[in-house]
Amino acid sequence: MFLRLAMTCGALVLALMIGAAQAQSGYPNRVITLVVPYPAGGTADLLCRFAADKAGSNLGQQAVVENRPGGGGGRVGTESVLRASPDGYTLLCAAQLTFSVTHLLFSKASFDTRALEPISVLAAYPLILIGRESLPFDNLADVIAYARANPGKINYGHQGKGQTGHLLGELLMLKGEFRMTEIPYRGSAPAINDLLAGNIDIVPDYLLANKSNIDAGKLKLLATGSRERLKDYPRVATIAETLPGVYADTWMAVAAPPGTPKEITTKVSRAIAHGFQDPELRSRIRALEAEALAGTPDEMRDLIRQSFETWAPVIDAAKIVVE
């Protein structure tokens, strides 16, 4: 009897193992959902939709985007993916801070994004430093010189505590050894509106959302976080030209729930990479002032490490904690 029971249990375990293997080898056989923890619209959302379209096309299965904003830093959508089944049918498409330093910013959070399984970094785009039209400085070097001589006289607005603009402002002050007065907002739009009105001095933000105002002369482009000067603005110095070794960009990436089999993450990564070789798509991504990457899971792990090495010391030095 015991032998029969053991054989029955063994057969059941074997059947489950075979079923799991078949499920992986047959992946995908139903709709894949890319959870985007931000509102619809904007560069981040568009890049995720490009990824869903190309991944679905190359995998032979529909992939859809589901926007689940909320919770500061996209916590609602991110946490939902962390709790999802590791079967490859629910994926996360989010920005770099989500993958690299969320556990530092949200120290009381009930989740840890380091457990996510990397799939692919989609594209990267530089951060920029912009000033009000009447700001009496045209570049970062002059801003730093004045701020060192007049601590706190210059202010900067950002889109919220622990957000990319906040961290860039703190990074500049840390590396440049100067102080600005911080003015937090709830999102980029109100900060930019106050900058356009001349109510604040500087905002760290993204190029795409501000290009029209820069080109119209309503805002000053003071510096870019790119490794080279931007083609459209050859006279504007990079941050690194003033503060050597300081680069600032952000990237969007796709990851899977903890425990998702490597076979699945590799398959999705290859589908995205193949799709992002499309010249028309790469042109559309360039129009967003971004650079298409679409690398491997290991390349994404390396970028997560680099992001952590950039931002963790800033978070620690500035004692940034988001409640």
Task: For each feature predicted by the language model, list its residue ranges.
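Short secondary-structure boundary segments
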Residues: 95-96, 133, 206-208, 226-227, ...
